[in-house]
A protein has these predicted regions:
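Helix-start/capping segments and mature chain N-termini
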Residues: 1-105, 127, 134-337
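Charged, gly/pro-rich active-site loop segments
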Residues: 95-96, 105-119
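Extended, Lys/Arg-enriched charged tracts that mediate electrostatic binding to polyanionic substrates
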Residues: 115-129
Length: 337
């Protein structure tokens, strides 16, 4: 990989050497299989192809300032994968299985881990789906769990920058008591139409409100939302919001900075009172929000063209832990190499 232009990497698939697989048949998981095959042979009547019995995860490995390679909160991603599997009535792999697979993938693909100074990282994608052959709607009795990886570039080229976001009440991300709190493919498929509408109008993301009343902020694109005001870090509390591992981390770092953390309903009109706000997730860590436009009420909320002080400090503190520049006092990182 000596000739790779790491700075040119985006967030896209890049072929690596190895992936790891487990199959579930006859009531038990197979031993780990390590393969270079990028393809899957699947029956046309496999349940995942017809009934959306599919889930995935996303996490990163970072080459640190000290040369060590760290996986960030891999056990938390494993536990969230278990929750998604339970929700879809899929067989539930153990945390140990998932963590072992992630560690193996990082070790096997060491040459694809970007150098420290590039700001890039190795993205891991665990994906699991039902493979039972049939026609009717029923839980899958066979499944496949794969973990693969791809090097990805820094989300913001040239430094963290605010994004433009639009509120759209005409599309909902997830129904109340639906699957919004688990990481399943259908949630993302359902967001594509409104996302494309927003992109056509010049917005990076759509801000989704609660599906029941369309009063409260839920998610921002495929990321959690948070707002900063009066010394508080405020983020939505809702059973249809995915529990973001990045948001969990930022809440702890906010407390470390002396902020009060509130998890509660956030009326969309409260956007007018925030000093800063942002979207957070694995891909970007934090995407500061510079402008919000409400498509239905025509209200506009502006937070400036530069990243706010609190967002920048939160971003820096988390990246410092991920890249080994700061003490990992909460034990979030697993040193792999």
């Amino acid at each position: 990989m000596e000739t790779t232009d790491w700075s040119a990497l985006g967030f896209d698939y890049c072929k690596t050497d190895w992936n790891v697989r487990y199959s579930y048949t006859d009531g038990k998981w197979s031993p780990m299989e390590v393969t270079q095959d990028e393809y899957i042979k699947m029956h046309m009547s496999a349940s995942c192809l017809h009934y959306g019995i599919e889930l995935f995860e996303g996490l990163k490995a970072f080459r640190g300032v000290d040369g060590k390679v760290r996986l960030f909160r891999v056990a938390d991603n494993a536990r969230r994968l278990q929750s998604s599997a339970e929700r879809l009535c899929l067989p539930v792999p153990s945390v140990e299985m998932i963590v072992d697979a992630c560690v193996e993938v990082v070790k096997r693909n060491e040459r694809f881990i970007p150098p420290y100074e590039t700001g890039a990282s190795l993205y891991l994608r665990p994906v699991m789906f039902g493979t039972t052959v049939g026609l009717g709607v029923k839980p899958a009795k066979e499944a496949l769990l794969i973990v693969y990886c791809s090097p990805v570039g820094a989300y913001f080229k040239g430094g963290i920058k605010p994004i433009r976001v639009a509120v759209d009440r005409e599309q909902d991300r997830a129904a109340p008591r639906g699957t919004g709190d688990v990481k399943v493919g259908g949630n993302y498929a359902a967001s594509l139409l409104s996302g494309e509408k927003g992109h056509e109008l010049g917005y990076s993301n759509i801000m989704y409100l609660d599906a029941a009343e369309h009063k409260y902020i839920e998610e921002c694109g495929a990321a959690n939302f948070f707002g900063i005001k009066d010394g508080k870090y405020i983020t939505p509390k809702s059973p249809s919001v995915l529990p973001s591992i990045t948001n969990m981390s930022l809440r702890q770092l906010a407390r470390d900075m002396g902020l009060t953390v509130e998890e509660r309903h956030i009326p969309v009109e409260e956007l007018a009172t925030f000093e800063e706000c942002g979207a957070c997730g694995t891909a970007a860590v934090i995407s500061p929000i510079g402008f919000v436009y409400d498509m239905q009420t025509k209200a506009e909320y502006s937070y400036g063209e530069e990243v706010g002080k609190t967002c920048l400090e939160l971003y820096t503190r988390l990246q410092d832990i991920q890249y080994g520049r700061a003490e990992d006092k909460y034990g979030w990182c697993t040193v792999v190499l």
